Every structure is written in C-alpha cells, then in structure tokens.
Amino acid sequence: MTFEVLGRDIIQFNFNNNVTSELSFSSIKGVNIFRVIQEGINNSIKYANATEISVNITESDSKINIEVADNGSGFDINSTELGNGLENMQKRIDEINGEISIHSENNKGTIIKITCDKNRTNVV
C-alpha cells in the first residue's frame, strides 16, 4: 500500500502477517503491542523521513515476533537521547514481559524488534 502522509511524498507500507494460529491477547497486552507498533510507524514518518515502512509479524511455538523497519535517516543509538516515544515503547513491552530491541544507523534506517509470549486460544 502507498499513502501520501502529512503532505509529503508517498510512503510505501508493507504489512506481512505470517501467523497461522489463532491468537488472543488480554486487552492490556493487545493495546501495548498496538501502541508500540503505532509509535514505531509514527517515528518513521515524523523523524526518519522514511519512504518505506514494513511491519512483519511471525511466530514460533511460544512467541510472537514483530518487526517494524524503515529505510529512513536512522540515528546513532549511542549518541541520541531517547525521547518519550522510545522510552514509552520500552515501558509498554516491559509491562507485558516482552523484549524490545532497536537497531539503527545513520542513513541506514531503523529496525525495532519486539518479542513476547503468545497466548493461544482455540476459537471455533
């Protein structure tokens, strides 16, 4: 999908859901996962001037893995003061006992990886 965002050039959005099982999360867990993905996309648009943003969701036996990646300007994670958005992402993932990692380099984009336990519910 491509969208014009905030009057800027068109941004290519790619969404890949490779989860085959039926998943059910508590409202707290679901909202926290949603908000972290939302913040990652918002940062890509607002700060990185990305022209392509990808969200990839995969699963293992007990984990769900989410990756938000962009081709934007990136940043030096060691010399950048983390703002409220990145701190809030960490707090949200901590709240659901998950893990988050952020990899970024100047002019090479950013990759945010989230891993958390999945709760399985058989839905008829």
Q: Predicted regions span which residues?
A:
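Coiled-coil dimerization/phosphotransfer module
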Residues: 1-124
